[in-house]
């Protein structure tokens, strides 16, 4: 059997035939060609493509075929080793990369650990300082309590003394060398006429009495203002001299309200009405009594 190029194909086995046709299918013009003419006889003969000559030689010489097999096996072994080395190198690179990351993390951990140790030491020192301070505070509290106990005792004596001094200052002040700055306490009866409210308005509350606390120097202007609001007002009680007219009225008002004898227009007001059963004469007697009681020295 001959090929298209005239080569005998009778001794070519099936795998080699496949190889031959695979080479033919590649883009080479000729795989096997003959040179028969020409002046140079040394060039005459059959020429084969380099990819095919090795197989032809292997067909012709078993020893050569073994040699080719060894070379091929060695080549494949080297390629396998190269691939394995590449894979190992890749893994080694990955290991190196991970090692660098681990080293970096370890450095950070070590740094954080050192910081935490430092902070722990500081906290221990602060705790010890707080314990010392707590002990000091307890000692100070003990001393403070002792001082408070003593000061409370002294304060009690001081309050009692101050109460007596205050009473003397308020109630036993001698007459001033300047009468114009002395106080007067006056109770006025207003005698106001009820005012009919306008449509839609509530009736205005009428108070029958007014307490005036005035200084002699301003008595005229104070009375003028009073009579402007209460044209028909009249004086029912005058205490010509009292060291503190405001204090006197507050004391009178407090007692009379508590005894349900008067109704005041407000806590800071001087206008009031008498309760049922309580007369004008009783009012004057009570005010004089309270004024005289204030002049007595407390025990």
From Swiss-Prot:
Coiled-coil region list: 76-150
PROSITE patterns, A to Z: KILA_N (PS51301)
Ranges where the KilA-N domain occurs: 1-75
UniProt cross-references to InterPro entries, sorted A to Z: DUF3627 (IPR022549), KilA/APSES_HTH (IPR018004), KilA_N (IPR017880)
Keyword Transmembrane helix attributed: no
This protein's name: Putative KilA-N domain-containing protein R879
Pfam families for the chain: DUF3627, KilA-N
Keyword Coiled coil in annotation: yes
Keywords attached to this entry: Coiled coil
Signal peptide: none
